[in-house]
Swiss-Prot record:
This is Cytochrome b6-f complex subunit 7. Belongs to the PetM family. It is found in: Cellular thylakoid membrane. It comes from the Bacteria. It is a single-pass membrane protein. GO terms for biological process: photosynthesis. Component of the cytochrome b6-f complex, which mediates electron transfer between photosystem II (PSII) and photosystem I (PSI), cyclic electron flow around PSI, and state transitions. Pfam families: PetM. The 4 large subunits of the cytochrome b6-f complex are cytochrome b6, subunit IV (17 kDa polypeptide, PetD), cytochrome f and the Rieske protein, while the 4 small subunits are PetG, PetL, PetM and PetN. The complex functions as a dimer. The chain crosses the membrane at residues 9-27. One of its GO terms (cellular component) is cytochrome b6f complex.
Length: 32
């Protein structure tokens, strides 16, 4: 089913966005 492929791709994309967001927040909050 294409639905499973779409769901998997969406989850992977969401995880990547969350990772980038967390990394950006850490860099922004860090005193460095």
């Amino acid at each position: 089913m294409a639905g499973e492929i779409f769901t998997t791709a969406f989850l992977c994309f969401s995880l990547i966005l969350v990772g980038i967001g967390l990394g950006y927040l850490l860099l922004k909050v860090a005193p460095d």
